[in-house]
Amino acid sequence: ANEIKLILQRAKLYPLAQPLATIDARQIEDVLKSSPFVNDAQCYKTQSGQVCIQLTQRTPVMRVKADNGDDYYVDNHGGVMPNTKYTSDLIVATGQINKWFAQNYISLLSKSLMVNELWRNQIEQINVLPDRSIELVPRVGNHIVYIGRLPECSSKRKREEDINNFVNKKMDRLEKFYKYGLSQAGWNK
C-alpha cells in the first residue's frame, strides 16, 4: 500500500483530500499499470464521492541470477520483473540463461515445480548448462538432479503442456527414487 501511495504521490495523482472533479481515474490506472509489480489496475469514482482503486499484483515464480550478471524475477505469465529489496522464497535459476529462455522455458519449469508441495519445498535451484540442459539442486541431500533438455516447441500452449508433462514424468521418477531408494540408503549417500 505504501508503494502505491508513493507512486501516485510522485505522479501528483494521490486522490486523498483532492476535489473529486480533479481526479482522473484513467490516468491513475495508467500510472499504476506502468509499475513493474502491478498486473492490472482499476480505478473509478463512486456516486458517494469515493475513489476506489483495485489492483492485482504480479506473482513471481522464480529469480534469475544468470552467468552474464542479469538478476531479475520472472512472473507467472513469463514477464520480467526487476530485482527489488524484498526477498521471496522462490526457486533461483542460474547458469547460461538469457531473458528469452527464462521467460519461455525456465519459468514454465519453475511453475510446474511450484504446484507440487514436495518440489516447492525440496528444489531450491535450477541450473542451466551451456547446452541448455537442466540440473535441479535440492535443499536436502548432497546430490544434483540432472533432468536433461526441456522439450522445445514454438506454440506457447503446446510448449507449456509439453514442459509440464516432461517435468511431471521426471519428478514422479525422482519421488519414487526418494521414497524407495534413499529411504533405504539415506539422504547423504
What are these regions (language model features)?
Residues 1-2:
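Short extracytoplasmic/periplasmic juxtamembrane "stem" segments immediately C-terminal to an N-terminal membrane anchor
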Residues 7-34, 39-189:
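Charged, solvent-exposed interaction patches on well-folded alpha/beta domains
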